[in-house]
């Protein structure tokens, strides 16, 4: 277990000399890394991450991506880091207007599919409006 702890802490950017320092000596960003390490080492069935890359350097972000891809069972990520999300995801769920859309793809492909879906919805709406106008005009003729 010690090797796993060391690997996780090193992956998140800590040096071996940091292992014996009290948590209170670390800045807020480094404390966030400590908490992230605690979560990852518990190996939960589901990990919920809110902006996990905010306090990480590039190497730590890459390590976290690799760790999550290879070790996590399920991850829900809320992030503005599009590259991180794109590299990590293989499923994107959109919740909008009371509906759930499930895309079994990465984030970039989801964006394309969402655009296509919205264009189809707009086209359908416009066709529906034309049909309503035609029916209304027909009814008005026979009043």
Which residues are covered by each model-predicted region?
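Short cytosolic helices in intracellular loops of multi-pass membrane proteins
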Residues: 126-142
């Amino acid at each position: 277990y010690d090797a796993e702890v060391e690997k996780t802490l090193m992956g998140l950017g800590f040096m071996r000399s940091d292992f014996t320092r009290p948590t209170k000596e670390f800045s807020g960003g480094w404390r966030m890394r400590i908490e992230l390490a605690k979560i990852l080492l518990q190996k939960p069935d589901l990990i919920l991450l809110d902006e996990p890359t905010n306090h990480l350097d590039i190497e730590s972000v890459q390590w976290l991506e690799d760790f999550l891809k290879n070790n996590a069972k399920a991850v829900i990520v809320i992030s503005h880091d599009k590259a991180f999300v794109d590299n990590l995801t293989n499923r994107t769920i959109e919740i909008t207007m009371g509906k759930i859309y499930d895309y079994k793809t990465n984030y970039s492909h989801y964006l394309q599919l969402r655009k296509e879906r919205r264009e189809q919805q707009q086209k359908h709406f416009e066709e529906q409006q034309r049909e309503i106008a035609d029916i209304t005009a027909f009814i008005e003729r026979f009043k």
